Amino acid sequence: MRPVDADEAREPREEPGSPLSPAPRAGRENLASLERERARAHWRARRKLLEIQSLLDAIKSEVEAEERGARAPAPRPRAEAEERVARLCAEAERKAAEAARMGRRIVELHQRIAGCECC
């Protein structure tokens, strides 16, 4: 039996037919999880943008209804409509801020994926 070199003790030799060592496999798994997270963040941001679009459409219809009501002989109480519009605007602003955070997260994930040197 021959003595074990210091290099052999630290690093096991890979055989040509053996499966990948844990380091590259872990790197690929890490990259795959980053890709999945980026895709999830993209779809979350897309959903938020669709919600914002829906809110903006609701605001637009409220404003148009209010304008039609203002021209009609018997106008609706203006305070109620203004309150609804203000509430919808506040919700749209909140959703827009959340969508902006999602966008920043997507950019951050993309930069992490681009900077990953595992593959």
Swiss-Prot record:
Comp. bias intervals (Basic and acidic residues): 1-16
Region Disordered, annotated ranges: 1-36
GO terms under biological process: regulation of cell cycle
Matching Pfam families: MRFAP1
Family matches, as PANTHER family: MORF4 FAMILY ASSOCIATED PROTEIN 1 LIKE 2, MORF4 FAMILY-ASSOCIATED PROTEIN 1-RELATED
Protein family: Belongs to the MORF4 family-associated protein family.
Assembly and binders: May interact with CDK2AP1.
Described function: May play a role in cell proliferation.
Protein name from the UniProt record: MORF4 family associated protein 1 like 2
Native organism taxonomy: Eukaryota, Metazoa, Chordata, Craniata, Vertebrata
